């Protein structure tokens, strides 16, 4: 059997490595391919439901709920004022976001005139803290459902991970102490709301634009990374 030269072996290994990298690379898809129902139904008005909270932070729902409406409006949709609709739901005895999931979406069309309903789930709203480092993670699942058919028109995940560590404060024990103090201070002052907005923005990059956006019905070929919750 002939020996394989080092050069030939290198080429083979590079080819195999290339296939592995390509296979592991995030999949890019288009809005039109992934969310065809958005272009068929073309919803104009969206009703935001109170978020479901699966994180360990009890106050996550209250903070996160303030971050959704503005970004959706910038995407070209008419969005019902969240605080008003949330109060109406409370007056109807619906205090818990989990209860909303059991209501047929057609009811929201009947009562509010909404074309679609946005359900959000807070998956992570967490601080991971160690002496010299800490990480802030905000992760949101979002799903838009039709009030005509109850079908899912769009769903996606937005996640933001922020390093709050103190960085390099010099060498030795003094440097370690300084880094620990900086990390503790930055962790204590961490504000989730801006990062929740970032998570929303990352999710909405895959949402087709609404009627009041200049690119309405022209973004079918726009690509994004597939992070749709399975």
Can you describe what each PLM-predicted range is?
Residues 1-25:
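Sec-dependent bacterial lipoprotein signal peptides
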Residues 2, 32-35, 103-106:
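A generic local structural motif
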Residues 24-44, 147-230:
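C-terminal/domain-edge helix-coil "capping" segments
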Residues 43, 55-119, 151, 155, ...:
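N-terminal segment of the mature soluble domain
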Residues 46-52:
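Conserved H-X4-D acyltransferase segment
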Residues 48, 72, 120, 142, ...:
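Buried hydrophobic packing residues in well-ordered domains
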Residues 53-56, 85-88, 123-128, 160-163:
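Solvent-exposed loop/turn segments at secondary-structure junctions
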Residues 97-153, 163-171, 175, 218-230:
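Surface-exposed short loop/turn segments
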């Amino acid at each position: 059997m002939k020996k394989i030269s080092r050069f030939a072996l290198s080429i083979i290994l590079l080819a195999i490595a290339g296939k592995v990298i390509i296979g592991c690379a995030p999949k890019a898809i288009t809005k039109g391919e992934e969310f065809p129902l958005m272009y068929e139904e073309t919803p104009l008005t969206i009703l935001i439901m109170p978020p479901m909270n699966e994180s360990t932070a009890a106050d996550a729902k209250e903070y996160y709920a303030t971050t959704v409406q503005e970004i959706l409006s910038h995407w070209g949709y008419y969005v019902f004022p969240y605080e008003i609709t949330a109060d109406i739901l409370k007056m109807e005895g619906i205090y818990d976001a989990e209860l909303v999931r059991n209501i047929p979406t057609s009811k929201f069309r009947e009562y509010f005139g909404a074309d679609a309903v946005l359900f959000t789930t807070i998956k992570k709203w967490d601080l991971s803290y160690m002496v010299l480092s800490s990480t802030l993670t905000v992760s949101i699942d979002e799903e838009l459902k039709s009030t005509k058919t109850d079908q899912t028109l769009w769903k996606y995940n937005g996640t933001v991970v922020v390093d709050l560590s103190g960085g390099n404060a010099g060498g030795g024990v003094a440097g370690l102490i300084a880094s620990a103090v900086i990390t503790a201070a930055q962790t204590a002052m961490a504000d989730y709301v801006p990062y929740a907005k970032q998570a929303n923005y990352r999710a909405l990059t895959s949402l087709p634009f609404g009627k009041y956006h200049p690119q309405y019905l022209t973004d079918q070929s726009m690509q994004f990374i597939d992070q749709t919750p399975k």
